[in-house]
A protein has these predicted regions:
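A metal-dependent hydrolase signature that marks the N-terminal structural subdomain at the beginning
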Residues: 2-4, 14-15, 22, 26-105, ...
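Pan-zinc metallopeptidase signature
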Residues: 212-245
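Catalytic Zn2+-binding segment of zinc metalloproteases
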Residues: 151-167, 180-185
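Catalytic zinc-binding patch centered on the HExxH motif and its immediate surroundings
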Residues: 99-125
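Active-site metal-coordination segments of metallo-dependent hydrolases
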Residues: 56, 60-63, 161-175
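Short helix/loop segments within enzyme catalytic domains
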Residues: 67-70, 80-82, 178-210
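Short pre-active-site segment immediately N-terminal to the catalytic Zn-binding motif
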Residues: 128-145, 161-167
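Active-site recognition of the HExxH zinc-binding catalytic motif
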Residues: 77, 145-158, 174, 178
């Protein structure tokens, strides 16, 4: 995946996707009064210990993809809001962190090996070492999915979307992430390399809740099949398929 035709070597959207992408689909609903995020505002330097099989992707490429994914998500949602006669208030901040407790959301510490959207302070936070490791072993598709899913949670908050069960919120965010990526590709803001969609599908089928987890349990995100179906429903049929209206 690339911005404006920038060609990139494709990474496999498998392997770490099982352990890593599943954890990205989290929206912090913190306890306590709203507060400013604590922690680093500028991206920290990721560990150099993580290596990718082909050794092609660098810290600079990772940081560039994070920024392109953020700008593209903002551009996509601004266009959707404008088409509805209103103006998007962009998500205030995207924060990289490295340690447990380095970032907090409404008094709740954000753990390592995670990515979240904080509703009370309006920011996305991601563990940079964990994310960079996934980027190098899974590929840049991981970054665009991660940012797309968490940005979708920010849009849900702006629209006042609320559900009785976590799984409903999460599957809708998967659909919205698919709509954002599909819309960005259709508009020419992003380009897909051959096989990227197959990698998205394989990766999404590799994530999901454990077979024994009840669908109604707090924190449920959906089965692998449900998550893949939601993402590609949004990708193929656009935002109208995501149940926002």
């Amino acid at each position: 995946m690339a911005a404006g035709g920038r060609q990139r070597r494709r990474g496999r959207f498998v392997g770490l996707a099982v352990a890593l992408v599943a954890a990205t689909a989290c929206m912090v609903e913190p306890v306590g009064r709203p507060g400013e995020p604590t922690g680093q505002r500028e991206p920290a330097a990721p560990s150099a210990e993580v290596t990718r099989a082909d050794g092609t992707d660098t810290v600079e490429e990772f940081q560039e993809d994070v920024e392109v994914a953020r700008r593209t998500a903002e551009r996509y949602w601004a266009a959707q809001f404008e088409a509805s006669g209103t103006t998007l208030r962009p998500i205030r901040q995207v924060i990289a962190y490295q340690r447990d407790g380095e970032v907090s959301c409404g008094g709740q510490e954000v753990p390592r090996n995670n990515a979240v959207y904080c509703t009370v302070s309006d920011f996305i936070a991601y563990d940079i070492n964990w994310s960079f490791g996934a980027f190098r072993q899974v590929g840049d598709a991981f970054v665009y999915y991660l940012i797309g899913h968490e940005y979708a949670h920010g849009i849900q908050t702006r629209l006042g979307v609320q559900y009785n069960f976590t799984i409903q919120q999460e599957l809708q965010a998967d659909c919205m992430a698919g709509a954002y990526l599909g819309g960005a590709v259709e508009a020419g803001w992003l380009t897909l390399d051959e096989g990227d969609l197959d990698e998205f599908r394989e990766g999404l089928l590799a994530v999901g809740d454990d077979p024994g987890q009840p669908w109604f349990a707090e924190g449920s995100h959906g089965t692998p099949e449900q998550r893949a179906e939601a993402f590609f429903r949004g990708y193929e049929r656009s935002l109208s398929a995501c149940g926002l209206g």
